[in-house]
Amino acid sequence: FSLAGNRLSLYGQDGSLKVYDADTGALLTDVNAGTIGDDQRVTLDCEEDGFVWMELRDADSYEIAAIRVYGPEGLVSDLSSLNETYNYLGYLTTDANGRPLYYGTRSVPGSSYATGCDVLDETGNVVMQGLGSCYSYYDNSLNALPDHVFVARRGFYYGWMDTDGNWLYCQSIFSSVNADDELGY
């Protein structure tokens, strides 16, 4: 099971995947996600509107074998093929239509430590690229970000960006007089 905010997701041994609204008890998602093998572990991350991020990992090596997104209508996408492109995949926020958006971090060619971040739709298509980083850091906290907004860094700027790629608030990473003395991000 997974409890995220006011969403409870349950994955049964028979492959059933159910998502409930913890406040009202309403059933948001009721699908069959298939069973997993004895040599796999499952991780669930319940997102907004009944969407579930499911990772299947090898029980011994913990390598990701599959990443699937389920919604109220069943399997939305199998993002397993993106494991070869991205070092990490995760939930970001929803778009203005309530559909989930994800982020993928990848190594930048020619650099041993730099990473880039792409914003992906639920089918794995890139909807925004060229970000240095992006995350929904304030999610589920007292300082939650507005709907359809995430923290991003692009070039020498960081701040709040909407899902259309517009800055709602940004500042230079060199915003301090003592920029050389501070990390800035």
Model features per residue range: what roles?
Residues 1-185:
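Residue-level detector of conserved, function-critical positions
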